[in-house]
């Protein structure tokens, strides 16, 4: 972060939004408007939501992704929109590990981690 100066100390922290309807991990216009509006609204730094680095590592099928060129292009749109709003841009990258196939909003079931709980296809 050397050489970067934020306009203030307010940061929008990353959150798990689960908002990719197409389940392809690609940024949508909703994401661009959502994050750009936070930048315009006064945050000095905007951190984009949890973004999976592989399809197998998603926390949900509706996560943003960063494993294809199409996704990278969408993330570029986000960065440009955040910068245009006057804020610095960051990203929370992640991988769900061995529990990547269990929906996080489900009640805990002893030993559950596979597609047996009506979850999405377990890839890992």
Predicted regions and their residues:
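Catalytic domains of carbohydrate-active enzymes, especially glycoside hydrolases
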Residues: 31-54
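Non-globular sequence segments
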Residues: 80-83, 94-124
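N-terminal amphipathic alpha-helix/helix-capping segment at the start of soluble metabolic enzymes
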Residues: 1-11, 82
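Hydrophobic faces of well-ordered beta-strands that scaffold small-molecule active sites
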Residues: 10-13, 46-48, 89-93
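Conserved, mostly hydrophobic/aromatic
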Residues: 12, 38, 42, 82, ...
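Aromatic- and glycine-enriched glycan-recognition loops and surfaces
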Residues: 25-31, 66-83
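Short, basic, glycine/proline-bearing loop/turn elements
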Residues: 13-24, 62-65
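Glycine-rich, proline-tolerant flexible connector loops at the mouths of alpha/beta enzymes
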Residues: 47-72, 93-107
């Amino acid at each position: 972060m050397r050489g970067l100066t934020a306009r203030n100390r307010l940061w929008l922290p990353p959150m798990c939004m689960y908002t990719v309807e197409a389940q392809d991990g690609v940024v949508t216009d909703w994401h661009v408007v959502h994050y750009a509006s936070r930048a315009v609204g006064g945050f000095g730094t905007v951190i984009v939501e949890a973004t999976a680095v592989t399809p197998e590592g998603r926390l949900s099928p509706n996560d943003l992704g960063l494993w294809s060129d199409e996704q990278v292009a969408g993330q570029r749109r986000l960065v440009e929109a955040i910068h245009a709003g006057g804020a610095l841009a960051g990203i929370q990258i992640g991988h769900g590990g061995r529990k990547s196939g269990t929906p996080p909003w489900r009640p805990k079931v002893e030993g559950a981690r596979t597609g047996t709980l009506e979850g999405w296809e377990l890839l890992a």
